[in-house]
C-alpha cells in the first residue's frame, strides 16, 4: 500500500524523469491505489480501440498513460519546482510551498 499522495487534481506539475522529462502540464486524474497520476497532454500512448456502436469510430487512438507520482514535481507559481509541506491554520490543513511558504 502506498502512502498519502501530496499531488492533487488540477495541480501544475513538471515531469522530472522519463521520456517526457522537463515538460509541464496539469494533473487530470490521480490514481491513489497505484501511486500514479495522469497529466493532460503528456505521456501519450497509442491504443487500439474496438468500435462500440454504429456511430463510434474504432481504430488506433492516442490516450494519456499514467505516470508514477515519484516522477512528477509540483510547481509553485512564485518559485517553480518545489516540495509540499502542510500547515494548520485555524483548524484547517493547507498545502504550502517549502521554498517560499505560499499556499498551493
Swiss-Prot record:
The keyword RNA-binding applies. Disulfide bonds: none annotated. Gene3D superfamilies: 2.30.30.30. Keywords: Ribonucleoprotein, Ribosomal protein, RNA-binding, rRNA-binding. GO terms for molecular function: rRNA binding; structural constituent of ribosome. The keyword RNA-binding applies. One of its GO terms (biological process) is translation. One of its GO terms (cellular component) is ribosome. NCBIfam families: rplX_bact (TIGR01079). Belongs to the universal ribosomal protein uL24 family. One of two assembly initiator proteins, it binds directly to the 5'-end of the 23S rRNA, where it nucleates assembly of the 50S subunit. One of the proteins that surrounds the polypeptide exit tunnel on the outside of the subunit. Part of the 50S ribosomal subunit. This is Large ribosomal subunit protein uL24. It comes from Treponema denticola (strain ATCC 35405 / DSM 14222 / CIP 103919 / JCM 8153 / KCTC 15104).
